Amino acid sequence: MTTPVPPVVAYEPSLGRDARQGSWAELSRGTFRTAIEKVHAAEWEAAARLVEVSVLEAEELRDVYDRWPTATLQWVRDHGATEVAVEEAVRRLGDLIGEPAMAGIAAEWPEYIAAAAAAARLCRDQDPAAAESIEAARRVWQGIHDRAVDRVAGMIDIAVRLVGESALGALWDHLMGDWYDVHERRYALTNQPWEQSAHQLMVAIVDGFHAHLAGTGRQGDIELIEEPHRTGFRFAPCGSGGRSLDPAITDGQPRSGAPFGFAVTTQPHDWAWNTVGICSYCVHCCQLNEVMPIDRLGHPTRVIDPPTWGPEATTTSCTWWVYHDPADVPDSVYRRVGRDPALRPSPSRETAHG
């Protein structure tokens, strides 16, 4: 009797859809890379399922990268910018990032759907060209993703230019209000045990950064770090904010440098870890994972060591930590976002890492 092979894709309740399955070490490897490995192992259906799940991993990005640019420009107008100034700023951005990026992710999304479907079909046909087709789909998605990130980051830069750096935290609060409410309801200690929340947060990390195509090879690879009281996920760099700072994956043109000049913080702010040189796009990670959950739940849900831009030294890697007990989060994490460590919940040792 043969031992059943564990599925590589199955329904994930916390995401409400299918997602990758496996050990954390397996999940730290990019989805496209893993699909190609399955082709080489003649696990054709597994390869096809992985290609198909890459579309689901990318879907949330398709949604927000479609919505955020328009919402940002409206917010800029609502905060006093003239239409002439907005139009001039948008025209400048278009000159920098090009018409395909300015047209938006929705216009390009069908191309990726078609590429992924073609790759999955070749896998099921057991075609020797399947591996090449999977890589072709990855390249299609990388181009679409990166152009969409340029558009979002460029719109955020417009907000900084026309409304001011000090308003950046409020802008991200506006853009992510729906996420905040879901985050608060789900991860409250009164809603479910932290062990369950920690697992869900980790699932969301690997799922999301596969889609961001983290890493210099842009495969979505993540470095897994296991420590006694926390688990870390390092992106070197992530494919969104970290890419804005990294010359190695932007053909020598990081978006925070010339000619783009996308904004980084020039003053300390609670919503940017009170650190100068934080990419304006990366601010949303501080708000969503640290500032907002501390304010609403009493503890961060994920603790981030962010990338930073500097004239002499730039750090492009980013590490997200999930603590096995939120009571173990250090005082310094609270203080660097201007919060009181007294908000921290009491230790709950029964919520051991699962």
Predicted regions and their residues:
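N-terminal accessory segment detector
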Residues: 2-283, 288, 294-317, 324-354
